[in-house]
From Swiss-Prot:
Its cofactor is a divalent metal cation. Disulfide bonds: none annotated. A divalent metal cation binds at residues 11, 13, 45. It comes from Thermosynechococcus vestitus (strain NIES-2133 / IAM M-273 / BP-1). GO terms for biological process: isopentenyl diphosphate biosynthetic process, methylerythritol 4-phosphate pathway; terpenoid biosynthetic process. InterPro entries: MECDP_synthase (IPR003526), MECDP_synthase_CS (IPR020555), MECDP_synthase_sf (IPR036571). This is 2-C-methyl-D-erythritol 2,4-cyclodiphosphate synthase. Keywords: Isoprene biosynthesis, Lyase, Metal-binding. Belongs to the IspF family. Involved in the biosynthesis of isopentenyl diphosphate (IPP) and dimethylallyl diphosphate (DMAPP), two major building blocks of isoprenoid compounds. Catalyzes the conversion of 4-diphosphocytidyl-2-C-methyl-D-erythritol 2-phosphate (CDP-ME2P) to 2-C-methyl-D-erythritol 2,4-cyclodiphosphate (ME-CPP) with a corresponding release of cytidine 5-monophosphate (CMP). PROSITE patterns: ISPF.
């Protein structure tokens, strides 16, 4: 009998000058980047939290705490691969992921397919198992004022097929 589990993830980071902007493992052209202990890739972080949440495994802060210097500047794709391994060790696999990135700028449409490709490769799944959408916050709140970028993700995990 097939079992399914669903997880939800969210992340937000502040935009600051002199940092690269990385979303979904792709470096984007922008004047500012996201501030964080790792590469601050909010999309990948939201996906990791959704995957971990689906199996009640906590959140990324539990596995990759910002207080631990080994994760300083870490590539979030490396962290995502570790999360994927945790899931596989427990007999689960990704059914699909649906994510939304919320940013006023830069416009994300040209980057969405490369992000899907990169994330699918890291997770070892087909590109059509990942949906990434982009929207703005209509100039409302910290994201609307271009102070940060946020991401939401939902992940479906399957076992027993």
């Amino acid at each position: 009998m097939m079992k399914i589990r669903i997880g939800n993830g969210y992340d937000i980071h502040r935009l600051v000058p002199e940092r690269p902007l990385i979303l979904g493992g792709i470096r984007l052209e922008h004047a500012c980047g996201l501030l964080g202990h790792s590469d601050a890739d909010v999309l990948t972080h939201a996906i990791m939290d959704a995957l971990l949440g689906a199996l009640s495994l906590g959140d990324i802060g539990h596995y990759f705490p910002p207080s631990d210097p080994q994760w300083a500047g870490a590539d979030s794709q490396v962290l995502l691969a570790k999360v994927a391994a945790l899931i596989a060790e427990r007999g689960w696999r990704v059914g699909n992921i649906d994510a939304v990135v919320v940013a006023e700028r830069p416009k994300l449409k040209p980057y969405l397919d490369p992000m899907r490709d990169r994330l699918a490769t890291t997770l070892g799944i087909d590109r059509d198992q990942i949906s990434i959408k982009a929207t703005t916050n209509e100039k409302l709140g910290p994201v609307g004022r271009e102070e940060g970028i946020a991401a939401y993700a939902v992940a479906l995990l399957q076992s027993g097929m």
